[in-house]
Amino acid sequence: MSDLDRLASRAAIQDLYSDQLIGVDKRQEGRLASIWWDDAEWTIEGIGTYKGPEGALDLANNVLWPMYHETIHYGTNLRLEFVSADKVNGIGDVLCLGNLVEGNQSILIAAVYTNEYERRDGVWKLSKLNGCMNYFTPLAGIHFAPPGALLQKS
């Protein structure tokens, strides 16, 4: 694997990592579905395992999006290990802030994502994502509001 191929692969994989988070936060079905191989698995500890692009959309449409008014995910500390020229293992930390539908409660989630990425026919996509939550913490008395929301109530 050439240095150029390794750098291009790393950039493509970093985009996949971000696209998963952006797809969930912005509720962009096309973006979210486009990052998975048909035989991929997305597992969220305590929720379940979903397969392929259709499974990712099922998880988003029937579990995540009905659970939250909105979310924002911050993905950090992405570390990639090239197993071969066409397979990469990744680990990264994710911080999610959001407002739950139930109780209109704000929440903080800290998780570790362990991912597997594969290149097939020159294209990188996710083959496995495992989300392990370290914290799922309601923020008592707090509701995240957009900028200016408090000013509008005055």
From Swiss-Prot:
Catalytic activity: gamma-hexachlorocyclohexane = (3R,4S,5S,6R)-pentachlorocyclohexene + chloride + H(+); (3R,4S,5S,6R)-pentachlorocyclohexene = (3R,6R)-1,3,4,6-tetrachlorocyclohexa-1,4-diene + chloride + H(+)
Pfam families: SnoaL_4 (PF13577)
Domain of life: Bacteria
Pathway assigned to this chain's UniProt record: Xenobiotic degradation; hexachlorocyclohexane degradation
Gene3D superfamilies: 3.10.450.50
Subcellular location(s) of the protein: Periplasm
Sorted UniProt keywords: Detoxification, Lyase, Periplasm, Plasmid
Enzyme class: lyase
One annotated GO molecular function: lyase activity
Principal cellular location given in the protein's record: periplasm
InterPro entries per record: NTF2-like_dom_sf, SnoaL-like
Keyword Lyase part of the UniProt annotation: yes
GO terms for biological process, alphabetical: response to toxic substance
Annotated active site: 25, 73
GO cellular component: periplasmic space
EC number: 4.5.1.-
Function: Catalyzes the conversion of the important environmental pollutant gamma-hexachlorocyclohexane (gamma-HCH or lindane) to 1,3,4,6-tetrachloro-1,4-cyclohexadiene (1,4-TCDN) via gamma-pentachlorocyclohexene (gamma-PCCH). Proceeds by two successive 1,2-anti conformationally dependent dehydrochlorinations. Also shows activity with alpha- and delta-HCH, giving alpha- and delta-PCCH respectively, but not with the beta isomer.
Record's miscellaneous remark: Is not N-terminally processed during export, so it may be secreted into the periplasmic space via a hitherto unknown mechanism. Gamma-hexachlorocyclohexane (lindane) is an organochlorine insecticide which has been used worldwide since the 1940s. Because of its toxicity and long persistence in soil, most countries have prohibited the use of gamma-HCH. However, many contaminated sites still remain throughout the world.
Family as reported in the entry's similarity comment: Belongs to the HCH dehydrochlorinase family.
Known partners and oligomeric status: Homotrimer.
Protein's name in the database: Hexachlorocyclohexane dehydrochlorinase 1
Organism: Sphingobium indicum (strain DSM 16412 / CCM 7286 / MTCC 6364 / B90A)
Gene assigned in the entry: linA1
